[in-house]
Amino acid sequence: MNVSRKELRVLNVLAQGGRILKHKDENGRLTHVACVTPEGWQLSLCTLEVFQQLKRRKLISSVKGGPYLITRLGLQALCGSSKTR
């Protein structure tokens, strides 16, 4: 699976225990996402576009409206990309 460098960095943070938090406006539309590392730092590479690509490929998912976490498919994509480098 082809995964861009930005997506790999976001997946790497999620694999280490990070989370993606979503922010919505008063109409319920997604306006901003924030990728937070386990230490509490915010990753600037995680844009709305990168988030949508990861979600579309089912590399991340949310359970019961919680923060987005990496899925098994995301872990496989992360491990598979490290073998090719």
UniProtKB/Swiss-Prot annotation:
InterPro entries: YjhX_toxin. This is UPF0386 protein MXAN_1729. Belongs to the UPF0386 family. The lineage of its organism: Bacteria, Pseudomonadati, Myxococcota, Myxococcia, Myxococcales. It comes from Myxococcus xanthus (strain DK1622).
